[in-house]
Amino acid sequence: MSVILTYNVNGIRAALRKDFDKWLKSTNADIVCLQEIKANPQQFDESVFTDLGYHCYWNPAENKGYSGVAILT
């Protein structure tokens, strides 16, 4: 059975400072949907997710007031 996780991170950089990556590893999720990432992939080290075995698909917000989403598979 696949484990699908959805999580509103309210800022991916802030979540990573709070050990989001360690928590994510403990979930052993197959697919992770992240909301409100509030960053572009160039603004943080994506290897934190690729090192966990995920392929990353980012759709950062282009307009002010929007936050963007990401999917990790």
Give residue ranges: language-model regions.
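N-terminal, active-site-proximal structural segment of metallo-dependent hydrolase catalytic domains
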Residues: 1-69
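Short, intrinsically disordered, charge-balanced linker/junction segments flanking boundaries
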Residues: 72-73
